[in-house]
Amino acid sequence: MGIAGFGGLGHMALKYAVAMGAQVSVFARNDKKKQMAQKLGAANFYTSVEECKEKFDLIISSIPTQYDLLAYTKLLKYGGEVAIVGIPPKDPQRNLDFGDLVLFSGNHKVYGSWIGGVKETQEMMDFSVKHGIYPEIELVTGQEIDATWDKLLNGQGNFRYVIDMKKSMENFKK
């Protein structure tokens, strides 16, 4: 299977897929997170989709921006699926774009998901505990929020940020 996008959602998708026994390839914009992807169990890491035509049964896209969905459907084997879990922007000028012919000629499926219900969430929490799956985080203080936001907007984010309230309050009192 493939995972497109290796940020907050993508790195968790990799951890879950590896724990379920999948051989996973990660697609990202550049090599900055290659070492981390390999450490978390990625079998392959690509910065281009060109070398992977008709290779995957499933691709999970966690990309939260506009991108060429057609490029990823071309990576699917016959009957393959793309699950979109990254929420694209609401800009009507920037919708996801893909060709109908690719879907029909390969009997592909494209679907999306935001979140499961209470039952599914509990199952994932139980699975996470059983397999030691937790997000990679970076603690930041309240004073670092603006700089952290800028990093996220510029594609320099590291998975998940958590505000350290204790340290923030200590800094505030100084």
Question: Across the structure, where does each feature detected by a protein language model lie?
Answer:
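Helix-to-beta-strand junctions that scaffold the AdoMet/dcAdoMet cofactor pocket
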Residues: 76-78
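N-terminal Rossmann-fold cofactor-binding loop
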Residues: 27-30, 62, 114
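Helix N-cap at the beta1-alpha1 junction of Rossmann-like dinucleotide-binding domains, i.e.
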Residues: 30-32, 66, 89-90
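Mid-domain Rossmann-like dinucleotide-binding core that forms the NAD(H)/NADP(H) cofactor-binding site
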Residues: 1-49
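C-terminal hydrophobic helical "lid"/dimerization subdomain
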Residues: 118-174
